[in-house]
């Protein structure tokens, strides 16, 4: 079985930010010359998620509102209480809401590759 590991770097400017990476994934698959298999798209960050859905502007707004309702940015998260947290990185930010939102979404999608 042929395998390929390719990194796609995505920069964000706000939270939440819903970014369509379809073109980048399709380019990697095409360049790989793998005709049949599975593309696994994965985010290694604990506050970034991978989901397949429709890229329709009003739906994207609905999704952002849904995430905010489920885990509001201004909610009370122990993760954000830096007076009680231990072993934090120097650049830590109060992002408990983003970790909780991530629980709803997940880190990866498996996409079948059929005939390229």
Each model region followed by its residue ranges:
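Active-site histidine-anchored catalytic micro-motif
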Residues: 1-116
């Amino acid at each position: 079985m042929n395998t390929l590991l390719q990194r796609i770097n995505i920069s964000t400017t706000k939270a939440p930010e819903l970014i369509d990476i379809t073109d980048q994934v399709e380019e990697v698959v095409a360049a790989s010359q793998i005709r049949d298999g599975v593309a696994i798209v994965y985010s290694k960050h604990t506050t970034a998620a991978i989901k397949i859905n429709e890229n329709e502007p009003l739906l994207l707004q609905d999704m952002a509102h849904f995430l905010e309702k489920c885990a509001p940015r201004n909610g009370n998260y122990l993760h954000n209480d830096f007076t009680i947290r231990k072993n934090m990185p120097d650049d830590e930010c109060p992002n408990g809401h983003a970790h909780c939102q991530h629980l709803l979404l997940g880190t990866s999608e498996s996409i079948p590759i059929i005939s390229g």
